[in-house]
Structures are given as structure tokens and as C-alpha cells.
């Protein structure tokens, strides 16, 4: 009866008319016995909860009970769309006949609390009540269990009628083919290149290759558009283009499509193999070339030894690449490769690209139907289609595929069935690497388990596996069926095609072994996953909106994490929005729950920063683009990178009370601070912002800026704290001596009397009096690290009030990033960086208000943001970097790393870092 009553109550609630969404408290018979959250009608949420764990890959389960994309098969980029031949079917057979329906036709409500989803189904004349709990093992404090590549599905079936019913649930799964670096197709942030073999070029000779960037409303229109390309593209002095340089996209067209980056490379022989071209990103941009001349319509580049020139010129619909031999000897085996990072309609999440052998083009399309292509009137001999972050290395190394390789047949698969009284499991895998999946149904008293066997005429492909569980239900009876999905794809590769693997392959030798582990530990995995949620939901000082946000905000730990075979653990900024490995300005915010709950993994990542620290002390901005772990670069946002590393190192030390950690990281801290001090070019004690971009990378600051200055001051305080802890009195005094003039300059240059202005460049007699919502970020971090106040208390309190009354004025759904003194929104940044609202900054503002003793300023704004995400947008499992402050709609940066900073509200409100 204890099991039956909650089920009956929840079924009655599901059958009630849909009301306005709100937070509720829901009860279950096992952990978490109480859930505080939003129970959505099916189809209302605009995001799907990811099932998966730390570095395992994920599969999405949407509010209809459908599997809507996966990132399991050696790829971290999700393959979107509802998965065909996949899902659950429920059948009820009795004296009146048999009724069989797919689960999505039955689901009525959906309650997501990562990593669990509770679905209520039935009604609509169906003779059974159905309650489904889907869960992946995820245990705060236990990284090993949290990295189990499996999902568990529990069905509770209720017979409300007066007659006996034979109930069956069938589970079918279309096993994804293992993703390999084939170079013929990709899904996500697609890029690629086309290549031409131009032969030998005699002295004085030249060759021209025209390249077109074409957009079309549909694939059907593309061939016609290729015949008459129109439009223009942007071109810089390096014969290339990178949207980040100007904060805008190229290739505007009425039918959609945009061009984020383009560039080229040459490979040839001249007394030995040579290469020359543009790297598009990083510094320096050019290899083997120097700028000779630049006009808006063309760029002339030359080899330093005078052996060749490359002229890149704008033509209708594209660019022309003219290569001249300006030397005295022939250039042998000349090859040209042209690169493009294209989007079909500026919607990165579902872009799909491929090398089309028929068109001789790199084609990109998305769910809108719009498409674009990189093509030429001169047929290419080769090319590559990949994902941004790994393709540029191949471009520079001339590692494309010949055109006759642009078509590949899928690999064969082997399958086997395991059937005994305990369970029925069907495994489908690639015999080479044992890569594949196992679907299983667990046995039990009165449970009949059956492997899925498609009829010979079935249209299901051979990769589909499936199992069925059957039980008898008497009148009023409740019975349970348990299913699980396990996966094993051990051959993951980095962007350059080198093996990186998965950590879980050290514990398991195939998906069947994963399934056995999950089956034997079913109760333990569900119980421990639910218990930490109970501690959050049971905390009386947490409002409902915050409890719901804390639990669900952890989803990026499944979506964006990588745990490699060699043990390295990292997070991506956003695998579908901006795939960069451990972007430090995002980690600064988003690593808070990792430091709280998985300290060994936090140390793991921080040690990688130690390993990648440059000889001059500079800390890298990231470990690499895309799926890259050993290509660090330090120039991007260098005015923040080293300071933020120091603050994270001290945060970890302070929270863990770990003197050994302090001793390990202290030498790197001193080197990082020494490098950061070199960025004070005018001697005012503050870092100069014009030296690089910062967190708002499409919004340039100059001179001293409130955002970066505050972080620098807090970092100096952290350096002094390290020195004091370790008994280094001389270095403590050095840090404090550097801190004092910096604080004075900050007050003199940035304090307006009500708030800290955006920036002030006294050398140029120029400044911006914009009020930045995040101007107190350095003070926020000083608070959370236990470093006290680095700004005058009366000023930071005044600034908090001013931010609330200006950046938070009106009915905005998040603090507007920049407000001018006249109350208008700052438009000086591009891509919305100045005039939109960054989600994380509202969470951080609220936390700062709590630390400063002004909760009434921050908590209402945090609550408004949380309600927008949960009740208006339905985007709890896909939060972006920024949103439209007026409409509340998500904008750029899907599934974003930094938003996990909401977890600092737990510490600020409760005064502790543990559950």
C-alpha cells in the first residue's frame, strides 16, 4: 500500500487539467522521496534531460519519453533529432483484447531532476497506469560511480481495473555506429576544406582557383545557386577571415547561412617540402608568408624568400586564389587547400555537413532546411569535413581525403543474446573494438523476459537491439519492470585523430560488462543518486526555485565532460555552442560544483594547467579548440587567465583546507602573478585591458577596467594568503605592496561616486561610464574564497544598489550587461555582449549581495531568472551564456559551462560548501 498510494496520487495529478506552471513538491516511495521542481505537461519543456555521467557521453530523454539524440559513440557532439527505431512500447492484454502504444503516446507529465526524470503516463482509454523513472548513476562525491556509461529505466505498472491484465513493456535501441575521424561527414559546429592539386609551377607561372561560398533555402535549390553564385565575403590582411576579430559573421544572405572563418594553406616543393598559409586563429596567424599589400578587395602575401606570392581577391560569390612563382626555381607538386567554418542558418546545434562527391563541395544544412556550401568551378581533388577545433591542424598538415574516398560503407556488427532467470540482455557491437550497446530487462518473480527478434520483413536495421518484459497484474495491483541501457565506445579520438579513449574502458571490457555491473548494483546506484538530492530538497532554508535550479544546473557535468583513458579530466565550454577545452574564463565560474563535490577531479584539471603553464608564467586560456587537450594557447584573454588561475587555486585550498595542495600549486601561483604584473604597462598597479579581449570577447575595453581590475586585486590578495599559509613573509609583503597602489588606482580611475565605470584609459583621455552588471566579479570571488573585501565596503554596497536599480531596472529577466549613464543599453559590444543579459552574472550578483549582507537586493533577481528558465522557457537542461533581457529567450552558447556558478548561492546562503 505504501507503494500504491503515491502512484495513485501522482496519476490523479497527471489526469487533472493543465494549470499554469509552478513549483511543486512531489513524493515518491524511494530516494529522492521528495522532489521540489516543475512537473511539465508533455511537450512543454524546450530542452531534454541528458542521461549519462562524468565523461561517458549522453543520450537525451525528452518530455514525451523519446530519445532525441545521443553523444555516445566516440563523439562528444550530439547527433540531434528523434532517434528512429528506438524507444519503449507498452502493451496491455486482457479479456477485451490487446492495446499496444508507444510510450510517447501515453506520457502526460515530465518531472526532471538531473540525472533523473519521472514520467507519468496512461489515461486516454489505456487500461494501465504507467510511472517511469529514468536515471543515470550520478553520485556527488563518488566519481567512479558517476562515470558509469549506463541509463536505468524503471516502469511501475498499475492495473486500476477489475480484471486481470497481461502487461508488457518492450525496449528497442538503434545502436549508434562508432564515430571515427572519417572526414566525410560531421554534425555540430561543422567546418572543413577543399583541396586542389595544381601540379608544378615554373618560374613566372601562375595558377588561379576560384572558390564560392553559396547559400540556398534548401538542398533542392543548392545546385541552381552553385551555377550562379552571388554575394560577397569579408577578407582581412592575411587573406582570411575570423568573426571574432570584428565580432560579426560574414556571408549575409536572404536565404540564411553565415561564414565564421575562412583561410587557406599551400603545400609545395622547393628544395624540400614547404608549407605556407593562414592558421585563422591564434597568434601568429601566418606561417611561411608575410603581408605584402592589403586593400579591402584583395590581400597580397609573399614568401619571405621571394619564392612565391599569393593574391586573395574578392569575386562575385566568393574569392579567387592566385598563386605566382616569383622565384628562380620551379615549385613542384603545388597543392592549395581552402578552409571554411560554415553555418546553414546560424543555428550551430543541429548543423550537419558532408563532402558531396557529386557536387564536389562541402555542404552544410540544418533542421530549418537552409543550407550553404564551399565549392568551386574547378573540381577539387580532395577535402575534409569535420568539427571546429580539429580541422585546422589537418589543413596545415595537408591531411585531407581524396575525392574517391568521400563515400564509405558502414562497418558490420556482431550481436549476442544473454538470457537466464536473472535477466535478458541483447548486445550489438563492432567486433574490432567491442564498441556498441547492450539493452537488458531484469528478471524477477513473475517477470518473463524476451529478447527482441525482428520479423524477417521488419524494416528495422541490423543495429537495433531490444528486449521485452512481461508481468501479470491483478485488479488494483502494481508491478515493476526494470530496463537498462549500457554503452561502450572505447576508441575516442581527439580532433587530430589521435587516440584519447574513455576512462570507463579501464573498468569495463564491453557494454555487456557495464550492463552486468548496473544490474547487480541497481538498488545501490538509484539509492545513492537519490540521496544527495534529498539533502538539497530537504534543506529548509532553500526556496523551491533555488533547490530546483541547483539540482538541474549540474547537467553540464554529463554533457560537457571528458575523462580520457590516460586519466585526464576536462570540461568543454560548450560542445555544441563553442567547443573549447577548459576555457579558463568559463571554468572560473563553472568549476564551483566540481571543487565542492569532486575535489580529485578538480585537482586533475588544475594540474593540467600547471603542466601547460608557459615558461614566463602565463597560464593558458584553454588546452585547445574542439577535442584537443595538448594545444594550449595563452594570448586569448591573457589579461584574465593568470589572475583567475590564482583565484581558483586559492579557492580550492581554502575550501578543502588542504595545505599539501597549497604547497603543490604555490610555485605556479607565484609565476602566474609575476606574468600578470607584466600586463600593467602604465605602472598604475592595474592590468591594461587593451592588451587583449576579456570575458566579453566581442566587447573591447581599454586602460583600467572594473571587471579585470577587481579580479586582479583579488588575485593579489590570494597570493598574499598563499604566502601567509606557507610562511613566506617576504612574498606576502610583495603581494600586499602591489595590492595597495592597485586599489588606489581603481578608486581614482573607476569610481564614479555611485558605481565603478566600465573602463578608463587615461593615456588616451578616453573612458566609458557604462555601468557593468559584473563590475564586482573580483569582489565576489574574494568573498567566496574567504579573502574579505578588496574594495571599500561603502563603495561596493553603493555599487550593488546602483546595479540593481539600473541594470536590473524594469521587468528584465536578468541583469543587463551594460547600461549607459542615460539609462540606455550599451551598444558598443557586438553579438549582443553589451546589451543582453549573461545568466551567470545574475547568479554572481545575487551571491555577492548575500555575502555583503544585502540579500534583498540579489535574491529577487535570481529568483526571477530561475523562474524564467524553468517556467517560461522550459530550458533547465539547455541554458545559454546570455539571454534576451526583455523576452527572456535564450540566445548564444547552448549547454554552457559557466552557468554552474549558481552553486555559489548554496555557499553564500548556507555558509558551507558540502551538502
Regions found by a protein language model. Name each.
Residues 18-34, 38-39, 47, 123-131, ...:
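Acidic/polar, glycine-enriched structural segments that form the non-catalytic walls/loops
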Residues 34-80, 253, 308, 451, ...:
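Substrate-binding groove/exosite segments of carbohydrate-active enzymes
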Residues 149-158, 315-328:
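Short beta-strand elements of extracellular/lumenal beta-sandwich folds
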Residues 164-166, 329-333:
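Short acidic/proline- and small/hydrophobic-mixed sequence motifs that coincide with surface turns
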Residues 691-725, 735-738, 742:
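Hydrophobic, small-residue-rich alpha-helical packing segments that form membrane-like cores
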Amino acid at each position: 500500500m505504501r507503494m500504491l498510494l503515491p502512484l495513485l496520487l501522482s496519476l490523479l495529478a497527471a489526469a487533472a487539467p493543465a494549470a499554469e506552471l509552478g513549483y511543486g513538491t512531489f513524493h515518491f516511495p524511494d530516494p529522492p522521496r521528495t522532489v521540489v521542481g516543475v512537473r511539465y505537461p508533455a511537450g512543454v519543456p524546450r530542452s531534454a534531460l541528458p542521461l549519462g555521467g562524468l565523461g561517458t557521453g549522453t543520450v537525451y530523454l525528452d518530455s514525451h519519453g523519446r530519445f532525441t539524440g545521443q553523444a555516445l559513440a566516440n563523439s562528444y557532439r550530439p547527433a540531434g533529432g528523434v532517434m528512429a527505431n528506438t524507444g519503449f512500447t507498452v502493451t496491455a492484454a486482457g479479456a477485451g483484447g490487446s492495446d499496444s502504444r508507444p510510450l510517447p503516446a501515453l506520457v502526460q507529465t515530465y518531472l526532471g531532476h538531473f540525472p533523473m526524470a519521472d514520467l507519468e503516463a496512461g489515461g486516454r482509454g489505456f487500461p494501465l497506469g504507467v510511472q517511469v523513472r529514468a536515471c543515470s548513476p550520478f553520485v556527488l562525491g563518488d566519481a567512479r560511480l558517476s562515470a558509469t556509461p549506463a541509463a536505468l529505466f524503471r516502469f511501475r505498472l498499475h492495473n486500476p481495473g477489475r480484471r486481470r491484465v497481461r502487461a508488457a513493456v518492450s525496449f528497442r535501441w538503434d545502436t549508434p555506429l562508432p564515430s571515427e575521424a572519417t572526414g566525410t561527414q560531421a554534425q555540430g559546429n561543422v567546418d572543413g576544406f577543399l583541396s586542389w592539386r595544381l601540379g608544378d609551377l615554373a618560374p613566372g607561372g601562375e595558377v588561379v582557383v576560384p572558390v564560392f561560398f553559396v547559400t540556398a533555402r534548401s538542398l533542392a535549390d543548392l545546385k541552381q545557386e552553385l551555377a550562379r553564385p552571388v554575394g560577397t565575403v569579408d577578407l582581412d590582411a592575411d587573406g582570411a577571415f575570423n568573426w571574432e576579430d570584428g565580432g560579426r559573421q560574414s556571408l549575409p544572405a536572404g536565404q540564411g547561412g553565415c561564414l565564421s572563418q575562412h583561410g587557406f594553406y599551400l603545400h609545395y616543393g622547393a628544395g624540400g617540402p614547404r608549407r605556407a598559409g593562414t592558421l585563422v586563429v591564434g597568434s601568429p596567424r601566418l606561417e611561411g608568408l608575410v603581408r605584402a599589400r592589403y586593400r579591402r578587395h584583395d590581400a597580397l602575401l609573399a614568401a619571405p624568400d621571394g619564392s612565391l606570392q599569393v593574391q586573395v581577391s574578392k569575386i562575385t560569390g566568393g574569392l579567387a586564389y592566385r598563386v605566382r612563382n616569383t622565384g628562380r626555381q620551379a615549385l613542384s607538386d603545388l597543392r592549395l587547400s581552402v578552409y571554411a567554418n560554415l553555418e546553414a542558418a546560424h543555428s550551430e546545434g543541429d548543423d550537419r555537413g558532408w563532402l558531396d562527391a557529386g557536387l564536389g563541395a562541402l555542404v552544410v544544412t540544418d533542421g530549418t532546411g537552409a543550407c550553404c556550401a564551399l565549392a568551386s568551378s574547378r573540381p577539387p581533388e580532395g577535402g575534409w569535413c569535420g568539427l571546429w577545433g580539429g580541422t585546422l591542424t589537418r589543413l596545415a598538415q595537408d591531411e585531407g581525403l581524396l575525392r574517391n574516398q568521400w563515400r564509405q560503407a558502414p562497418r558490420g556488427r556482431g550481436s549476442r543474446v544473454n538470457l537466464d532467470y536473472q535477466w535478458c540482455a541483447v548486445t550489438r557491437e563492432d567486433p574490432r573494438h567491442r564498441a556498441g550497446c547492450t539493452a537488458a530487462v531484469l528478471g524477477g518473480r513473475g517477470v518473463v523476459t524476451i529478447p527482441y527478434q525482428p520479423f524477417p520483413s521488419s524494416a528495422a536495421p541490423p543495429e537495433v537491439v531490444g528486449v521485452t518484459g512481461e508481468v501479470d497484474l491483478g485488479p488494483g495491483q502494481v508491478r515493476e519492470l526494470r530496463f537498462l541501457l549500457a554503452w561502450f565506445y572505447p576508441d575516442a579520438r581527439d580532433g587530430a585523430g589521435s587516440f584519447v579513449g574513455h576512462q570507463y574502458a579501464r573498468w569495463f571490457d564491453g557494454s555487456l560488462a557495464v550492463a552486468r555491473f548496473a544490474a547487480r548494483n541497481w538498488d545501490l546506484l538509484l539509492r545513492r543518486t537519490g540521496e544527495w538530492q534529498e539533502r538539497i530538497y530537504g534543506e529548509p532554508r532553500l526556496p523551491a526555485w533555488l533547490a530546483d535550479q541547483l539540482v538541474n544546473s549540474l547537467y553540464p557535468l554529463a554533457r560537457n565532460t571528458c575523462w580520457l583513458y590516460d586519466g585526464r579530466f576536462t570540461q568543454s565550454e560548450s560542445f555544441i555552442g563553442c567547443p573549447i577545452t577548459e576555457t579558463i574564463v568559463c571554468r572560473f565560474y563553472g568549476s564551483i560544483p566540481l571543487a565542492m563535490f569532486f575535489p580529485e577531479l578538480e585537482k586533475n584539471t588544475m594540474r593540467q594547467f600547471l603542466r601547460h603553464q608557459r615558461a614566463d608564467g602565463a597560464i593558458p586560456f584553454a588546452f585547445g579548440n574542439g577535442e584537443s587537450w595538448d594545444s594550449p594557447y595563452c594570448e586569448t584573454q591573457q589579461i584574465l587567465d593568470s589572475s583567475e588561475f590564482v583565484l581558483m587555486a586559492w579557492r580550492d585550498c581554502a575550501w578543502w583546507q588542504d595545505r599539501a595542495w597549497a604547497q603543490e600549486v604555490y610555485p605556479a601561483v607565484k609565476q602566474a602573478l609575476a606574468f600578470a604584473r607584466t600586463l600593467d604597462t602604465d605602472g598604475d598597479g592595474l592590468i591594461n585591458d587593451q592588451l587583449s579581449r576579456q570575458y566579453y570577447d566581442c566587447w573591447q575595453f581599454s586602460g583600467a577596467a572594473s571587471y579585470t581590475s577587481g579580479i586582479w586585486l583579488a588575485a593579489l590578495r590570494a597570493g598574499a594568503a598563499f604566502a601567509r599559509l606557507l610562511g613566506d613573509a617576504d612574498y606576502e609583503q610583495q603581494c600586499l605592496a602591489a595590492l595597495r597602489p592597485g586599489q588606489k588606482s581603481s578608486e581614482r580611475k573607476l569610481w564614479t561616486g555611485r558605481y565603478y565605470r566600465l573602463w578608463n584609459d587615461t593615456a588616451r583621455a578616453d573612458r566609458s561610464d557604462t555601468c557593468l552588471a559584473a563590475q564586482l566579479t573580483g569582489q565576489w570571488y574574494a568573498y567566496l574564497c574567504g579573502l574579505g573585501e578588496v574594495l571599500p565596503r561603502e563603495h561596493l554596497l553603493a555599487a550593488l544598489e546602483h546595479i540593481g536599480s539600473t541594470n536590473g531596472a524594469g521587468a528584465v529577466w536578468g541583469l543587463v550587461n551594460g547600461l549607459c549613464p542615460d539609462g540606455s543599453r550599451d551598444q558598443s559590444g557586438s553579438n549582443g555582449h553589451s546589451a543582453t543579459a549573461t545568466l551567470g552574472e545574475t547568479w554572481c550578483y545575487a551571491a555577492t549581495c548575500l555575502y555583503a549582507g544585502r540579500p534583498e537586493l540579489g535574491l529577487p533577481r535570481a529568483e526571477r531568472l530561475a523562474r524564467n528558465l524553468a517556467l517560461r522557457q522550459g530550458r533547465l537542461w539547455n541554458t545559454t551564456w546570455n539571454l534576451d533581457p526583455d523576452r527572456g529567450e535564450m540566445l548564444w552558447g547552448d549547454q554552457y559551462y559557466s552557468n554552474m556558478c549558481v552553486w555559489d548561492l548554496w555557499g553564500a546562503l548556507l555558509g558551507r560548501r558540502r551538502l
